């Protein structure tokens, strides 16, 4: 045993012992890491799946180790690091670490530009992730800058009028609708119809998202999500160079164009699925594709009925509601439309209370207003009664004013649209009331005052 100790402590063998120990530790580390890391090609799809399944916390440390192995093997600027950087960003985002997620996305973006070029279309997916993260952080200006940059990159790669740009046009239009830029959205959806007109001849159903977007832009113009005096000033801004919004100013208040877009969608669906137009059809006579067509046609017709109701054409809306109710009933348990209770179509956002300077030191408290009401056959709110209010009277007027402007799709039965009582609307909000002093806090405040005076 002594001889063994003497042997190990000799200078010649000390370095060998250290090298041997390092080799054993490295071998054990590779054993702990997934077998996929030890292979030349690393499959990261499993990590992507686990992140989608909300299992990011269980795999993020392992993913960091995988990143380190790839970086050691391939170098700090290897394109092999792009995907793990994206996955690390996705994982951190799932865990709510949005700033850290952006750092990973920034690195992935830098690696993509370094390896594939400054304006490479491969970077668009990363930029979209950055935009979505900024939206979660409620940084709307930064999110818009990212969305518009991704659009410009793809437009440069494919051509501004290429049908390959249609997915980017659709996404940009959806973003503008989310951020209340109805003119920008309208211009993009029209551009999409022009760019895809050749492709839409063979598959007109592919034009439906753009037609629906045009209708939604008019609906958003007429029914803004909040009370504003001149909302057109907020709706005509875009950083996209080839998007001219000047001509769209002439489309303001041209609401029949939105109705025509919805009517065109119905015509496309009827042409696509002629079997569902037959008044004698039943669910049993339709195959899976035709059944899906019937559901989509019903939804398109319902969108037009809701449009009529929103724009005050109640008689037209009721006629269509009765027709859709009958068509949906033909599908029996396969019908996907529920008319058993009113559905909210529009309600303005209730303005929150302002935290003024004198309230700056107060902690927010939870308030609530609860109102019961009736929805009549025209979709309007009647007979409101406040059943709960705390603090009493603080937000009652704002809530009731909002409900007076609300529009519901009424309950529909065999006889058509009907009145519905017993509906409830509940609004919770933050307010800043004075905090009641406890004896302990009062005593502490007195001590602080004495120390200051001394």
Please provide the spans of the model-predicted regions.
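N-terminal secretory signal peptides that target proteins for export/translocation
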Residues: 1-16
């Amino acid at each position: 045993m002594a001889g063994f100790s003497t042997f190990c402590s000799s200078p010649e063998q000390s370095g060998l012992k250290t090298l041997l120990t390092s080799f054993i530790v490295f071998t054990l580390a590779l054993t702990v890491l997934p077998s996929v890391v030890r292979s030349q090609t690393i499959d990261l799809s499993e990590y992507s799946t686990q992140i989608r399944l909300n299992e990011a916390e269980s795999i993020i440390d392992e993913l960091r180790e995988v990143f380190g192995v790839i970086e050691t093997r391939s170098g700090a600027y290897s394109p092999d690091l792009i995907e793990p950087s994206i996955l690390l960003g996705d994982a951190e985002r799932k865990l709510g670490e949005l700033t850290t997620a952006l750092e990973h996305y920034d690195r992935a973006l830098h690696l993509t530009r370094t390896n594939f070029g400054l304006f490479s279309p491969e970077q668009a997916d990363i930029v979209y992730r950055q935009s979505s993260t900024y939206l979660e952080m409620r940084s709307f200006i930064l999110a818009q800058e990212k969305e518009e940059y991704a659009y410009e990159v793809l437009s440069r790669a494919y051509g501004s009028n290429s049908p390959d740009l249609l997915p980017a046009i659709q996404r940009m239009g959806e973003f503008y609708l989310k951020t209340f830029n109805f003119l920008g959205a309208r211009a993009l959806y029209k551009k999409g119809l022009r760019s895809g007109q050749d492709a839409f001849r063979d598959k007109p159903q592919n034009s439906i998202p753009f037609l629906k977007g045009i209708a939604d832009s008019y609906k958003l113009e007429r029914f803004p999500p909040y009370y504003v005096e001149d909302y057109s000033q907020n709706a005509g801004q875009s950083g996209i160079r080839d998007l001219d919004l000047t001509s769209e100013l002439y489309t303001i208040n041209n609401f029949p164009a939105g109705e025509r877009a919805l009517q065109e969608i119905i015509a496309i669906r009827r042409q696509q699925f002629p079997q569902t137009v037959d008044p004698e059809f039943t669910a049993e006579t339709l195959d899976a594709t035709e059944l899906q067509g019937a559901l989509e046609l019903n939804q398109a017709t319902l969108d037009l009925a809701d449009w009529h109701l929103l724009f005050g054409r109640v008689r037209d809306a009721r006629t269509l509601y009765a027709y859709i109710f009958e068509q949906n009933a033909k599908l029996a348990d396969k019908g996907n439309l529920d008319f058993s209770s009113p559905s909210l179509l529009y309600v303005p956002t209730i303005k929150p209370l302002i935290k003024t300077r004198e309230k700056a030191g107060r902690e927010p408290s939870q308030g609530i207003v609860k109102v019961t009401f009736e929805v009549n056959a025209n979709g309007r709110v009647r007979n409101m009664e406040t059943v709960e209010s705390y603090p009493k009277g603080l937000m009652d007027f704002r809530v009731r004013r909002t409900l007076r402007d609300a529009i519901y799709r009424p309950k529909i039965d065999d006889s058509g649209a009907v009145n519905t009582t017993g509906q409830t609307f509940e609004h919770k909000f933050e307010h800043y009331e004075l905090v009641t002093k406890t004896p302990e806090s009062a005593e502490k405040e007195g001590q602080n005052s004495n120390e200051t005076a001394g």
